Curated annotation (Swiss-Prot):
Gene3D superfamilies listed in its UniProt record: NADH:ubiquinone/plastoquinone oxidoreductase, chain 3 (1.20.58.1610)
GO MF terms, alphabetically ordered: NADH dehydrogenase (ubiquinone) activity; NADH:ubiquinone reductase (non-electrogenic) activity; quinone binding
Gene name of the record: nuoA
Organism per entry: Buchnera aphidicola subsp. Baizongia pistaciae (strain Bp)
GO CC terms in record: NADH dehydrogenase complex; plasma membrane
Protein name listed in UniProt: NADH-quinone oxidoreductase subunit A
Amino acid sequence: MLKSSVIAAQYWAFFTFFFIAVSICVFMLSISWILGGRSSSRYKNTPFESGIVPTNTTNMYCSVKFYLVAIYFVLFDVEALYLYAWSVSIVECGWIGFIEALIFILFLLSGLIYLISSKLLVWKSKNNIHVT
C-alpha cells in the first residue's frame, strides 16, 4: 500500500469531519446570502433603541485599565481553577504533584509581583484632579 493511502485510511474520520464542517459553513453563508435582504437606506445603519431616535453618539470613553483588570482577572481565575483541580486530586498526585503545584504557584506569584512592581494595578493616574 502507498504511504498516502495509509495516511488517508488512518485519518478518514478527521477528513470527513472537516469536510462536513466546511460544507455546513458554506451552506449557511450561501443560504443567508440568497435569502437575506438587500435593501439599503440611510436608516439601515442607524442604531434602533425601542423606536427612540438616539440623541447623541454612542462613542464613549472607557479607560484601558478596566480591560487590563478584566484580563488579569481571567488569567488568575483560570489558574485558580487549575489549582482547584489539583487540590481535589492531591492524594493521587503525591509529592511530585505537590512540587509541580508549588512551582506553578511560584510562577503565579512572580506574575503578580511583576504586575505590582510595574504599577499596572494602580488606579490613580498622575493627572487625577480631585474636586472637593
